[in-house]
Amino acid sequence: LQGDLVINGGSDPYFVWEEAIALGNAIQKWGINQVRGNLVMVGNFWMNNRYDNVVAGKLLQEGINSATWSRNVRSIYKRMPAGTLMPKVAIAGSVISQKSVSHKIPIIRHKSLPLVHILKTMNVESNNDLAETLAKKLGGAKVVQRKAAWSAGVPEAEIKLVNGSGLGVENKISPRAATAMFVAIQRYLQTSPWVIADLFPVSGYDTGTLTDQSRTIPQGAVVKTGTLND
């Protein structure tokens, strides 16, 4: 490619190494093995919970070029489906961030994973960083607090959030509010193809935090675990 490779980010909350590898392979399908110019980051591009465009861009630069992979990326690649190609798209220039570009030719539109998959992953793994990213996308902890209380039909005083992940003793949710939120989610899903088990861990089927042998949870129960040491 004689010129810059422009990445126009759209605030994908779960763009991780696997996504970078897939994007690298998609770029190579266009016959692009080397970019003579820069990797230009435009918009909100997040990767591995890094929100700075240049920092996230450098991670992407590594992800699309297997010749530069760290041991961590190689281990992640080995868990991907058999036959997944190892992309080799080399960037000759630098990673830079710009508000916009004057002239661009679109070649690829990379879609995020479906939100239902992202939420299931977040809850099964109890991924605090991902929860924080989603809360940020919605407007922050206080916006989430207000929307959750309204949806659950409980006073806002029963839901107190200082961050999006719930990590920290300052976050407080009453038992009634926690139960009401589950009921509200199930009610919301009634007009969709999904059920609440598509969003939360299911005991006996999902791993993540449910693998703790000290938990005595009936098989098939839909739950959300939470542990916090002060």
Residue ranges, per PLM feature:
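A small/polar active-site loop signature that marks catalytic segments
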Residues: W30, Q34-V35, F45-L199
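Short, Gly/Ser/Thr-enriched beta-strand-loop segments that form substrate-interacting elements
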Residues: V101-I108, L210-D230
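A glycine-rich, acidic short-motif signal
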Residues: L1-G57
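Short, flexible micro-motifs
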Residues: V40, L167-V169, N229
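An acidic/polar, Gly/Ser/Thr-rich interaction patch typically located in mid-to-C-terminal regions
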Residues: D198-D206, T211-D212
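Short amphipathic alpha-helical surface micro-motifs
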Residues: A20-G24, S203-Y205, T216-G220, D230
